[in-house]
Each structure stands twice: as C-alpha cells, then as structure tokens.
Regions:
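C-terminal output helix
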Residues: 108-118, 125
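Conserved Asp/Asn-Gly motif in the active-site loop of CheY-like receiver
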Residues: 33-37, 110
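Charged docking surfaces used in two-component/phosphorelay signaling
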Residues: 17-25
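Receiver (REC) domain active-site loop signature in two-component systems and cognate sites
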Residues: 57
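Short hydrophobic/Thr-rich beta-strand motif most characteristic of the beta2 strand and flanking loop
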Residues: 27-34, 42
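Active-site beta3 strand of CheY-like receiver
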Residues: 46-52
Length: 130
C-alpha cells in the first residue's frame, strides 16, 4: 500500500470523512489534515503519493500550501488535486506554474475524485517506469 497513500486536506470534516471512506474501500491509505500548515508537516513526514487539498482553508490556503510544497525538496514533485467551490479561482496559468495535477469543483462525486487520483498516479507510474 506504500504507493497508494493519499493526504486529504480540508477544514470541512464531513468531506474528509466521505472521501476517506471511498479511498479506503479502494485500497488507499489515507492521512488527513484540516489546514495547510498541518498538511505541509504531514506531507514532509508521511510522504504521500498524492495530495488532495481544499482551496480555501484557515491558517494556510490550498494555494499557499502548494507554493510551499513546490519549494521543498521532499515534496516538490508530489501531485496535487485542488478542490474548490470557486472553479474560476484557479487559472490554467496558475495550475501550470504550480504543477497542480487537477482541479475539482465542489460539490464533487467521491467516485470522480477517485478516478482522478487513479489517473494521475497511473500517469506518474508510467513516467517513472520510462
């Protein structure tokens, strides 16, 4: 399960709970945080294969988290999916600049998120294998 570790970051506990159930039922190990600062610490210590983060959170926003992740050697290449209630808030340019692997607007389906995670991890595995 070492290649199926997901860090979920959201201050809405019910979203974390629903997503965690879906991922665990599909063989993923789930760790979670309710703000960007805690998530950064977990990303460094737990080394998730992918991070799913909310855009708008207290303490440190999702964008601030991604900026910090990209500056740190251990986390600079970790794929990130951004969840947002404001799909217009993240431009294509920002996504490319910060290497955000995907964005989903709330409300989203846990199945849709799972498919995104699996696609991103599969593509990443193909890149590593080649």
């Amino acid at each position: 399960m070492a290649d199926k570790r997901v860090l979920i970051v959201d201050d809405e506990i019910h979203i974390v709970h629903v997503v965690a159930i879906k991922l665990r039922n599909n063989g993923y190990e789930v760790i979670s945080a309710d703000n960007g600062a805690e998530a950064f610490e977990l990303a460094c210590s737990e080394k998730p294969n992918i991070i799913v983060t909310d855009y708008q959170m207290p303490v440190m926003t999702g964008m601030e988290l991604v900026e910090k992740l990209r500056q740190h050697e251990q986390t600079k290449d970790t794929p990130v999916i951004m969840l947002t209630a404001r799909s217009f808030a993240i431009s294509q340019e920002q996504q490319e600049q910060l290497q955000i692997s995907g964005c989903l607007s709330k409300p989203f389906s846990p199945r849709e998120l799972l498919e995104n995670i699996e696609d991103i991890l599969y593509q990443r595995k193909l890149m590593v294998d080649n």
